[in-house]
């Protein structure tokens, strides 16, 4: 029996990039940011949830170099490296190009980090921010260079790293699909994203300036994650007055893809609160 999902995929030409994105639903824009080295497929569970899409227009885009968004012309002339500036510009440029009015932005891992920068620099343009697996900084606990070593199968290595970050309680089919997304990544892309995550994107000295009265901040962190642990998120939130923090039991570093149904049980109440704020 055939089943057609309600998700629609499109390409948007923005500056010198051809960006692929998927969307479903209508209402408040909910812009979803994937993790390092992966792509927007991670949010298919959210895109397919009628309880979310009845009130929210869910949009997940692939960053350039990721998924179905190819790198720009001339990409072969230099190594890919994600920075705070390029990441922020990419997100806000995409939102403006699509004409999204004060979207909610939800990001995981590197996306969970960049929402803190968005809270500092673009709070008035956003309705709310949701950080998944958020930490103000992650110490380098391994040398990421070997992920792009010519004697290492980069796809298998990246998949192995991703596997170790997931909960042992997550369903096997979803776990292995998440691993597959990582195994498909382009050479050097995961490493380039980790440059932001582990080197350049340290925001510890500025998070105390975030004003949640301007833009509410919600942080949800899976308990089975040694990269951005609940302790890391708690330490960040403790310095941001008004930020809300929840530990997601039984989930790991990729909650939206490794166990979508369990993750939605935590996400829906947050979205309901955001929606109720709009009505008050």
Predicted regions mapped to residue ranges:
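Active-site loop/oxyanion-hole signature of alpha/beta-hydrolase fold enzymes
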Residues: 59-106, 265
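Flexible "cap/lid" loop of the alpha/beta hydrolase fold
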Residues: 116-157
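Short beta-strand/loop motif that positions the catalytic acidic residue
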Residues: 213, 219-221
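Conserved alpha/beta-hydrolase catalytic His-Asp/Glu region
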Residues: 140-141, 155-212
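Conserved HGGG/HGGXW glycine-rich cap/lid loop of the alpha/beta-hydrolase fold
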Residues: 17-73
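Alpha/beta-hydrolase fold catalytic core
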Residues: 1-31, 52-56, 100-101, 268-280
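Catalytic active-site module of serine/aspartate enzymes centered on a nucleophile-bearing elbow/loop
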Residues: 243-280
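Acidic catalytic loop of the alpha/beta-hydrolase fold
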Residues: 223-228
């Amino acid at each position: 029996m055939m089943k057609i999902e309600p998700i629609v995929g499109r390409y948007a030409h923005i500056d010198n990039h051809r960006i692929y994105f998927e969307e479903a639903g209508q209402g408040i824009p909910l812009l979803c940011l994937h993790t390092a080295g992966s792509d927007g497929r991670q949010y298919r569970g959210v895109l397919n949830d009628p309880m979310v899409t009845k009130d929210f227009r869910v949009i997940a885009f692939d960053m350039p170099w990721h998924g179905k968004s190819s790198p720009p012309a001339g990409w072969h002339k230099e190594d890919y490296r994600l920075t705070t500036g390029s990441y922020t510009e990419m997100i806000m440029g995409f939102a403006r190009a699509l004409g999204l009015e004060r979207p909610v932005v939800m990001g995981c891992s590197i996306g969970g980090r960049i929402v803190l920068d968005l809270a500092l620099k673009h709070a008035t343009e956003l309705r709310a921010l949701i950080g998944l697996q958020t930490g103000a900084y992650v110490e380098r606990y391994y040398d990421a260079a070997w992920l792009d070593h010519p004697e290492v199968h980069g796809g298998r290595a990246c998949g192995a790293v991703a596997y170790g970050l997931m909960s042992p309680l997550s369903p096997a089919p979803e776990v292995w699909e998440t691993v597959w997304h990582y195994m498909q990544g382009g050479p050097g892309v995961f490493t380039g994203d980790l440059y932001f995550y582990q080197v350049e994107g340290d925001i510890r000295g500025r998070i105390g300036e975030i004003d949640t009265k301007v833009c509410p901040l919600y942080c949800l962190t899976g308990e089975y994650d040694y990269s951005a642990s609940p302790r890391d998120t708690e330490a960040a939130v403790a310095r941001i007055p008004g930020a809300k923090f929840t530990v997601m039991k039984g989930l790991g570093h990729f909650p939206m893809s490794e166990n979508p149904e369990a993750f939605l049980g935590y996400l829906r109440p947050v979205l309901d609160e955001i929606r109720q704020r709009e009505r008050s």
